[in-house]
């Protein structure tokens, strides 16, 4: 699963509960689930699922006289065993079936359960990664665009079929899904039969022959067009999109076959499943989900060719694909060991970026991951493998993802590439179609390398925190001396063992690498050099999971930026030279008043890597200091010539307040750019000065389906606050994906604030529906925030009271207690 993070730490203060977590080990297995056969059909009118489950089970080891299934929120119509109806007890969560006798591990039994799943009647939970946990979702069920899909992780598949809903339970399956014959279905495994019925329905029989985890079982149905990728012949690779987007399937997903081949080559293990399908659905409650052979994506991956110029979702696609080895083929045996799934998937994003887009792109991916972890580490530090937590959903954080991926890279650097991938091969083959814990991974590495690696796994997987180093360097009498101290305090009370690279650079651009090994609180290293270095860089590729405080003069940082061969080294130098609090524009201007720093920033707009060019452009937003004309000229060149759309777009935004009519010529030319991000930025920049043809410009773009362009048009319409714009706002907002909708709700709020009461009342049904019915808690919360802007209206107060009463997510319920409506 890949997290789609939208709101950082919104509820941290709400949930900082002083509570000692309990030990969370693997679920005890009293029974083994051998095979699941499901006959299911959706009732679109009441958003329920009619089902019959035939479950083949056997005692795991000890004899048993009853079985308990996870079955959340069902109406259980009857249960039979050995062709006879049997009594059962059911509390709405657990379904207990007694046998009246003891069964031993040589007995295989078949239980038949007739039921109706009622997911909308469940109390809703969720997390940052998975915003709801009711398992089965109906989207627009009473319209031609209706969809049905499931989300099983962590333990929500028991909301739509009875099972043993734990990650250490594997099964094979047959699913018979009956739907209207106009709909397309998808499930795990292969579609082996279509049965047409006389009532305009069809039953699709999907069969999964190889065992996989229960939480990876899925179904989906809707109006989808299936595109089979003809560039790949080893097995079926296919993509499911709604009809209006089907023509873009290969542009969106078409690098999947190359990813498969690359990962197979790295791991020495062929893709282990029958097929690989990807489907994009609306209102998905996560970023994406690696259901075996049938990955589900949120509709954020659905992009037009103009949007793909700005950004593709290769990282997400690679992430979910890599799970089919790490997570699906070998599955974590408990949520405590989740990094065995997610850290590897996170690392795959680096592997693919490095392979396909180049080493600099891989470094940039790693930099972003490290930044994500370090931000989270300011508020919590946990072991990667956590046997103590309050809620399994807490495991889905930047520790399990970003930090874990970086730790795997450190392990790779320590043992070497060949040993790393050979060890992964051993791990995958030894645990194929089974579950694993962290020590299975350690023992695979020890088997290959011949080295005891407990120290590494204890230090990085089983202990919280990260390394923090203080570094000083000085050169005297032909010798460079490094003094490195490890910070020891209440947050970090241990000494790390750290192999580190040191990059030493000289005035002629020459560089040399040295290696040091830290194992003490304070250590001194010396190197004989023929000349004084112009910069010294610890960990030049940014591979250490940690923080390095290495004070340097500006001249050294400038030399480091200009001469360092790594993106990480240049990034660190640029960041230190130009860092300022995000809201402190005056401080930024003061930094750029230094001609040497300003010159470097202008040089950085020509960096070989687009991410650093973009950072440089962003430092020049609204610049009005010394050397203004030089800055303006450089930004004009960026707009005309930079190959990256995001850099061009940011250059336009940097110049939008420069008040030079000549720039408007550039902006108008940019309205024809292939990139929607560039067009949106150009439109925003032009509208700043409210040109005579502003209304005509906006009219041209008001129906373009892109969030960047929407935001530019919406800001203009919000300031106008004309009554007739309400239908445009609500219509367009309904078309946006979840992330996009959250991003622009503030603009709609601006429109409402500046409108009269009649328009505000007209918006209330839209906001009320969103606040109650959106599956994503952050969208419901955003709708409430917009309603509060018009909260003086009696009708709004009444609506808010109804929203608060209808809310089932405990996080939001707790927040809403703070709002006074009277």
Where are these regions (language model features)?
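Hydrophobic alpha-helical and helix-loop surface patches within well-folded domains
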Residues: 2, 17-18, 82, 206, ...
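Terminal, low-structured helical/coil segments at or just beyond the last alpha-helical repeat
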Residues: 798-822
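Structural detector for internal amphipathic alpha-helices that build alpha-solenoid repeat scaffolds
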Residues: 542-546, 570-591, 603, 611-626, ...
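Amphipathic alpha-helical scaffolding segments comprising HEAT/armadillo-like alpha-solenoid repeats
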Residues: 550-560, 583-605, 625-640, 660-672, ...
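Bacterial Sec-dependent N-terminal signal peptides
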Residues: 1-24
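Acidic/His-enriched low-complexity segments
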Residues: 18-274, 398, 413-415, 431, ...
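Short inter-helical turns and helix N-cap capping residues of alpha-solenoid HEAT/ARM repeat scaffolds
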Residues: 565-566, 608-609, 643-644, 674-675, ...
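Non-catalytic accessory/interaction domains
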Residues: 179, 202, 227, 243, ...
């Amino acid at each position: 699963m890949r997290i789609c993070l939208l709101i950082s730490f919104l509820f941290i203060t709400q949930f900082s509960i002083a509570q000692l977590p309990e030990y969370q080990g693997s679920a005890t297995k009293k029974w083994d689930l051998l095979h699941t056969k499901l006959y299911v059909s959706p009732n679109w009118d009441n958003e329920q699922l009619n089902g019959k489950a035939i479950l083949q089970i056997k005692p795991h080891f000890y004899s048993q006289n009853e079985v308990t299934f996870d079955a959340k929120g069902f109406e259980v119509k009857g249960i039979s065993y050995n062709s006879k109806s049997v009594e059962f007890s059911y509390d709405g969560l657990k379904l207990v079936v007694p046998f009246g006798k003891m069964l031993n591990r040589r007995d295989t039994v078949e239980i038949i359960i007739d039921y109706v799943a009622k997911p909308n009647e469940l109390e809703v939970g969720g997390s940052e990664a998975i915003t709801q946990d009711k398992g089965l979702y109906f989207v627009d069920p009473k319209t031609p665009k209706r969809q049905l899909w499931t989300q099983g992780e962590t333990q929500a598949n028991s909301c739509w079929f009875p099972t043993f809903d734990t990650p250490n339970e594997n099964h094979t399956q047959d699913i018979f899904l009956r739907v209207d014959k106009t709909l397309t279905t998808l499930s795990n495994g292969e579609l082996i039969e279509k049965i047409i019925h006389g009532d305009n329905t069809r039953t699709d029989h999907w069969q999964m022959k190889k065992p996989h985890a229960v939480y990876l079982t899925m179904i989906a149905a809707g109006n989808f067009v299936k595109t089979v990728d003809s560039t790949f012949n080893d097995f079926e690779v296919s993509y499911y999109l709604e009809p209006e987007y089907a023509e873009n399937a290969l542009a969106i997903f078409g690098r999947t076959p190359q990813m498969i081949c690359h990962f197979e080559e790295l791991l020495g293990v062929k893709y282990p499943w029958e097929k690989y399908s990807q489907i994009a659905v609306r209102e998905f409650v996560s970023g994406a989900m690696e259901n075996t052979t049938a990955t589900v994506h949120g509709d954020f991956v659905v992009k037009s060719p103009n949007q793909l110029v700005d950004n593709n979702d290769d990282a997400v696609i690679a992430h979910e694909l890599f799970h089919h080895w790490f997570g699906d083929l070998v599955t974590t045996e408990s949520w405590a060991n989740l990094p065995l799934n997610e850290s590897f998937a996170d690392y795959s994003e680096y592997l693919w970026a490095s392979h396909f887009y180049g080493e600099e792109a891989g470094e940039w991916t790693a930099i972003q991951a490290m930044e994500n972890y370090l931000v989270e580490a300011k508020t919590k530090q946990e072991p990667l493998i956590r046997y103590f937590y309050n809620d399994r959903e807490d495991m889905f954080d930047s520790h399990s993802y970003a930090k874990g991926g970086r730790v795997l890279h450190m392990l790779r650097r320590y043992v070497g590439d060949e040993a790393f991938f050979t060890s992964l091969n051993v791990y995958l083959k030894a645990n194929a179609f089974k579950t694993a814990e962290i020590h299975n991974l350690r023992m695979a590495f020890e088997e290959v390398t011949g080295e005891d690696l407990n120290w590494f796994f204890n230090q990085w997987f089983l202990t919280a925190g990260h390394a923090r180093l203080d570094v000083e360097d000085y050169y005297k009498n032909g010798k460079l001396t490094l003094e490195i101290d490890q910070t020891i305090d209440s947050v970090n009370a241990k000494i790390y063992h750290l192999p580190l690279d040191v990059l030493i650079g000289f005035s002629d651009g020459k560089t040399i690498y040295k290696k040091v090994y830290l194992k003490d609180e304070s250590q001194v290293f010396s190197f004989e050099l023929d000349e004084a270095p112009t910069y010294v860089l610890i960990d030049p590729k940014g591979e250490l999971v940690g923080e390095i405080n290495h004070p340097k003069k500006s001249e050294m940082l400038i030399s480091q930026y200009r001469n360092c061969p790594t993106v990480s080294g240049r990034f660190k130098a640029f960041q230190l030279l130009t860092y300022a609090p995000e809201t402190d524009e005056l401080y930024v201007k003061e930094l750029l008043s230094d001609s040497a720093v300003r010159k470097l920033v202008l040089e950085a707009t020509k960096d070989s890597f687009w991410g650093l060019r973009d950072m440089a452009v962003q430092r020049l937003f609204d610049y009005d200091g010394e050397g203004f004309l030089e800055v303006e000229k450089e930004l004009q060149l960026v707009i005309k010539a930079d190959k990256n759309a995001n850099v061009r777009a940011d250059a336009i935004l940097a110049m939008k307040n420069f008040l030079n009519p000549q720039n408007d010529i550039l902006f108008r030319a940019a309205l024809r750019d292939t990139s929607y991000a560039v067009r949106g930025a150009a439109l925003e920049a032009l509208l700043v000065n409210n040109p005579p043809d502003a209304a005509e410009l906006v009219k041209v773009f008001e129906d373009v389906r892109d969030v960047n362009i929407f935001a530019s048009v919406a800001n203009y319409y919000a300031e106008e606050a004309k009554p007739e714009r309400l239908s445009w706002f609500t219509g367009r907002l309904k078309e946006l994906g979840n992330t996009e909708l959250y991003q622009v709700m503030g603009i709609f709020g601006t429109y409402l604030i500046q409108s009269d009461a009649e328009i505000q009342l007209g918006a209330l049904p839209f906001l009320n529906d969103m606040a109650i019915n959106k599956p994503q808690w952050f969208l419901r919360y955003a709708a409430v925030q917009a309603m509060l802007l018009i909260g003086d209206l009696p009708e709004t107060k009444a609506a808010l009271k109804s929203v608060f009463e209808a809310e089932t997510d405990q996080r939001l319920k707790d927040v809403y207690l703070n709002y006074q409506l009277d």
